[in-house]
């Protein structure tokens, strides 16, 4: 395998499948099976999961006139629901899994402790981080960048419903072009909304590459961790980053 330790960022929407909300059991089973295959191949896997399949903080706050911080705390609890559900699925696939949360809830999960998380990874356990960063006004993408830096992950794999980063929304713009390679600055300058700017800045500061790939294609988690050129790679232009050559200009597919 190409990588020793990775962080997989799963959006809550990725767990919905074709449902309008909630969790699709078949999608959950598929993700768990692929994560288990990666772990059995010797890769240490940490996961940050969102909660958008249950609660959309900013959208709900705007619609109901709800305080933004309160809406964000509700969203953090939604991520814990997803984390516990994902833990159960991965353990049914045969891989021991721990959930660590940024908000204490000792009856159902461990508190987030960096050294303990790393120790779990070294023992071959999957670690799922729930409750975001524990702070309102920060996204789970920022949490992914933060936790990846803390546990010394080599890369963030951001699993989405599209096969990479485009110069426009491919759902509404059929002529949109997909980028194979981008720099952090490209993402910020072009406002490509791969992740929020705080998350991108954290990755840039820590030279932490990001790979955006399509979760809906079976086997893609295993393939992307193997190092197959799937999706869009984001990193420093001047660094080779695990054997991926630095780009000159952006290369649209």
Swiss-Prot record:
Activity regulation, short description: Inhibited by UTP.
Residues where UMP binds: 51, 72, 133-140
Enzyme Commission (EC) number: 2.7.4.22
Enzyme class name: transferase
Cytoplasm as UniProt keyword: yes
Gene3D superfamilies to which the protein is assigned, alphabetical: Acetylglutamate kinase-like
Residues annotated to bind ATP: 9-12, 52, 56, 160, 166, 169
Keywords, in A-Z order: ATP-binding, Cytoplasm, Kinase, Nucleotide-binding, Pyrimidine biosynthesis, Transferase
Predominant location: cytoplasm
Metabolic or biological pathway, per its Swiss-Prot or TrEMBL entry: Pyrimidine metabolism; CTP biosynthesis via de novo pathway; UDP from UMP (UMPK route): step 1/1
Annotated compartments: Cytoplasm
One annotated GO molecular function: UMP kinase activity
The keyword Disulfide bond belongs to this UniProt entry's keyword annotation: no
Reaction catalysis annotation: UMP + ATP = UDP + ADP
Gene Ontology cellular component annotations, sorted alphabetically: cytoplasm
A Gene Ontology BP annotation from the UniProt entry: UDP biosynthetic process
Oligomer status and interactors: Homohexamer.
Protein family (similarity comment): Belongs to the UMP kinase family.
Function: Catalyzes the reversible phosphorylation of UMP to UDP.
Name of the featured protein: Uridylate kinase
Biological source species: Synechococcus sp. (strain JA-2-3B'a(2-13)) (Cyanobacteria bacterium Yellowstone B-Prime)
């Amino acid at each position: 395998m190409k990588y020793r330790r990775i962080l997989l960022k799963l959006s809550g929407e990725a767990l919905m499948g074709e449902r309008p909300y909630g969790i699709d059991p078949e999608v959950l089973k598929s993700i768990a099976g692929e994560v288990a295959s990666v772990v059995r191949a010797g890769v240490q896997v940490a996961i940050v999961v969102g909660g958008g399949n249950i609660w959309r903080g900013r959208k709900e706050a705007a619609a109901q006139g709800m305080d933004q911080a309160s809406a964000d705390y509700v969203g953090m609890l939604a991520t814990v629901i997803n984390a516990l559900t994902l833990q159960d699925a991965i353990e049914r696939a045969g891989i021991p899994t721990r959930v660590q949360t940024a908000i204490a809830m000792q009856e159902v999960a461990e508190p987030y402790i960096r050294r303990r998380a790393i120790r779990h990874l070294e023992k071959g356990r999957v670690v799922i981080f729930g409750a975001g960063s524990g702070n309102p006004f920060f996204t789970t993408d920022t949490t992914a960048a933060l936790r990846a830096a803390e546990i010394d992950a080599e890369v963030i794999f951001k699993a989405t419903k599209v096969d990479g980063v485009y110069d426009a929304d491919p759902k509404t713009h059929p002529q949109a072009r997909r980028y194979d390679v981008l720099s952090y600055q490209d993402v910020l300058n072009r406002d490509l909304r791969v992740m929020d700017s705080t998350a991108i800045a954290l990755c840039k500061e820590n030279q932490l590459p990001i790979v955006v790939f399509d979760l809906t294609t079976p086997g893609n988690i295993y393939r992307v961790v193997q190092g197959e050129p799937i999706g869009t790679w984001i990193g420093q232009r001047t660094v080779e980053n695990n054997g991926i050559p630095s780009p000159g200009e952006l290369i649209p597919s």
